[in-house]
Amino acid sequence: TYLFKLLDSEKTAEVLLELDEYDRAKILEILSAKEIAQKIDEMDTDDAADILGELSVERKSKVLSKIEDEEHAKDIADLLQYHEDTAGGLMAKELVKVNENWTVPTCVRKMRSQAQEVTRVHSIYVVDDNNVLKGRLSLKDLLVAPASAKISDVAIPKVDYVNVNEKSDEVARIMQKYDLDAIPVVDDD
């Protein structure tokens, strides 16, 4: 445990994710809410929600309140609302999404900004002004599109998606059937 506390937050976050539940619980027991929050701050939202899901309701609340990045804390809290064996419980909030009304240069600029917060870019999703999924964007289509083009002109309107309440085994079946690395998760709104 002493050695664990000597590691920086990024390394300890990685270690926490690799430990089995029993060993992770032992470590989390001795860390303060602030120390756990520092580790959680280094994780993607889906991983952070998995770790926090193992804590008591009271401890979870304390840790969430200590996370410095308020938006990150809100995203994690959102994910904790979903049962772990549903699409909502599996999803990550880190993604690249673009608005259908943006021009190509605006899109590229905004994607650069979003990409700094994302570990991997599997897909680029297109949404409308109400954040409703409208399609996906191919990087190739974006690169060859004229600068004056709107994203709605180059987007691919057909996109497979699942509902937040879809069971995880059904999500896996759909992803395997269509050979997908990622699939957008949408709510009823």
Where are these regions (language model features)?
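Hydrophobic packing positions in regular secondary-structure scaffolds
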Residues: 1-189
